[in-house]
């Protein structure tokens, strides 16, 4: 998405303010002061503060959808956790790229609907690709729900603690945890539909 200099300044100002306060506590005056722009310049580019937030949320969401759609069907739950799929790595690269915005979006004062939509998107991604590799999946909805929570919470921790791992390193660490959960808990993936589920 192409943005002009004024939009970039407005977005950057919003992101900085969003780190410490909720969207409803951010005013146009604050944005203008931090970006050194006039109110008229703000209104030439955005209808209101919510429009700035929505643009950034949609940008992140569309990038995640693109990454998911480009998935090459390498199994994310392969036991060899040292070889995460390229798109799993790309997901964490995206998280790091939008780290400043996600600091606010995934915080306690962030937009709950953005967190929920991110979780649904991640869960749907996991479900579609698990089913492409396993004939029978026991408790798949619960598995995907828990794993998507874990992945998003891992993203939050990465952002909060300024994790210095590379995108691949982050993907490896998170994948190990997900694989451990899937293979060691009662909620597990079954590769053979004829196996006894008792």
Task: Enumerate the predicted regions with their spans.
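Amphipathic alpha-helical packing segments from all-alpha helical-bundle domains
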Residues: 109-134, 142-149
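Hydrophobic alpha-helical segments that form the core
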Residues: 138-161, 168-181
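Short, amphipathic alpha-helix enriched in basic
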Residues: 5-28
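Amphipathic alpha-helical segments used for helix-helix packing
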Residues: 89-119
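Hydrophobic alpha-helical connector segments
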Residues: 69-100
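Residues in the helix-turn-helix
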Residues: 9, 41-43, 101
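Alpha-helical structural segments
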Residues: 8-16, 34, 51-71, 86, ...
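Helix-turn-helix
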Residues: 20-51
């Amino acid at each position: 998405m192409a943005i002009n200099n004024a939009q970039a300044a407005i977005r950057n100002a919003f992101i900085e303010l969003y780190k410490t306060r909720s969207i409803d506590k951010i005013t146009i005056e604050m944005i203008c002061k931090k970006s050194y722009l006039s109110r008229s310049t703000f209104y030439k580019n955005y209808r209101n503060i919510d429009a700035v937030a929505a643009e950034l949320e949609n940008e992140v969401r569309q990038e995640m959808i693109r990454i998911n759609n480009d998935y090459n069907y390498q199994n994310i739950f392969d036991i060899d956790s040292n070889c995460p799929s390229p798109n799993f790595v790309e997901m964490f690269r995206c998280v790091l790229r939008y780290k400043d915005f996600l600091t606010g979006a995934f915080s306690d004062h962030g937009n709950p609907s953005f967190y929920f939509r991110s979780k649904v998107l991640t869960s749907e991604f996991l479900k579609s690709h698990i089913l492409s590799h396993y004939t029978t999946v026991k408790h798949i909805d619960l598995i995907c729900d828990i794993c998507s929570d874990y992945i998003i919470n891992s993203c939050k921790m990465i952002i909060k603690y300024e994790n210095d791992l590379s995108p691949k390193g982050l993907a490896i660490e998170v994948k190990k945890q997900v694989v451990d959960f899937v293979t060691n808990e009662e909620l597990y993936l079954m590769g053979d539909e004829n196996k006894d589920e008792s």
